[in-house]
Amino acid sequence: MGGLPEGHAYFDQLVSEQTGAIVVDADYRVAPENVFPAAIDDADATIKWLQENAEERWGADPTLMTTSGFSAGGNLAFAVTQQKGCQAPSPTAIKAITTFYAVIDFRLSPWEKPHPDNMPKNDPAKVFLPLFDAYAAPARAKHFEDPRLSPVLSEKESLPERILLVVPGIDILVAEQTEFAERINNEDGEREVQRVEILHEKDLFHGYLEVPDIVVKRDIKHRAYKKAIQVLKETHRKYDWTWNA
């Protein structure tokens, strides 16, 4: 299971500098050595520790926590909301989620997921598909309806008021993310700001934020970062926190 923290230091820096947030980028046990629920157990333990210790350790407000993640890390950013202490009306409820090409439906193996028309016919990552399924496959039958494994199943009441999905168009994860957004927003009905927003980068691919700038220019990557930081700032202001760098 990927979505590893080492690749996201630049985004972490932007969030810290532009929002004033205390940013904690956590690691977790990975597959194939550690399958579900190892990673989400580690993420849950991290959130619980932060709720109990972040204020004393760093002066951070445990009642204004948001989560974020890339790829498999996006799965965990969603799945931690299934803890009661991360849901309203708990004061420590997660206030927003921002994810980038998040894996939110493990009910299907990667090769079973719908492939967009613009996916390359000879996918260079095809050889790795069994590895991509190593986290979920051993637990799939038993946990088929478990939102800790497949957050696409989350009830809207368990989710925060603001969610951003950055969805590149050249990716097998497009359908699960767009269908999730449509379901939650339809269940919400009319709102001033939709709960789930999508930034759809139709000509980009899974992992594009983590490749060198010579492959994907930094200004293109910054469209996703800028939108995520906007959502975080708006969430902070809603709860009376503003940052003047």
What does each of the following model-derived ranges do?
Residues 1-245:
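Alpha/beta-hydrolase superfamily serine-hydrolase fold, recognizing
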